[in-house]
Amino acid sequence: MEIKQISEKADIIFSDNAAKKVSTLIEEEQNNNLYLRVYITGGGCSGFSYGFTFDEKRKEGDSSVTNNGVQLVIDPMSYQYLIGATVDYLEDLQGARFIIHNPNAKTTCGCGSSFSV
């Protein structure tokens, strides 16, 4: 009998803290059709910048990660830069914000909102 190992490691991790915050924001908007879209654009002090927005529409080729019924959606171009990353929500002395821990980033800026590969 052959036993296959099933890896439960996701390509992109959507943390519990981030999912809870997104759920709260969706409730405030009173629109259960919203997803959190994470994307990457050119710019920032390190070459690429992370972006977050709410979206109601999924586009062809989008990938998604679900945590506690909340969906995180990523376009194909951004996805390739986010493989292995964790999307999290942090509240500390610097304020409250969504952050990305990205193992693909060679350098990041001081605030963590831009990176280079």
From Swiss-Prot:
It comes from the Bacteria. PROSITE patterns: HESB (PS01152). Keywords: Iron, Iron-sulfur, Metal-binding. Binds 1 iron-sulfur cluster per subunit. InterPro entries: FeS_biogenesis, FeS_cluster_insertion, FeS_cluster_insertion_CS, FeS_cluster_insertion_RrpA, HesB-like_dom_sf. Its cofactor is iron-sulfur cluster. SUPFAM superfamilies: HesB-like domain. The keyword Iron-sulfur applies. Pfam families: Fe-S_biosyn (PF01521). Iron-sulfur cluster binds at C45, C109, C111. Gene3D superfamilies: HesB-like domain (2.60.300.12). Homodimer. Belongs to the HesB/IscA family. HAMAP family: Fe_S_insert_ErpA. This is Iron-sulfur cluster insertion protein ErpA. It comes from Vesicomyosocius okutanii subsp. Calyptogena okutanii (strain HA). The lineage of its organism: Bacteria, Pseudomonadati, Pseudomonadota, Gammaproteobacteria, Candidatus Pseudothioglobaceae.
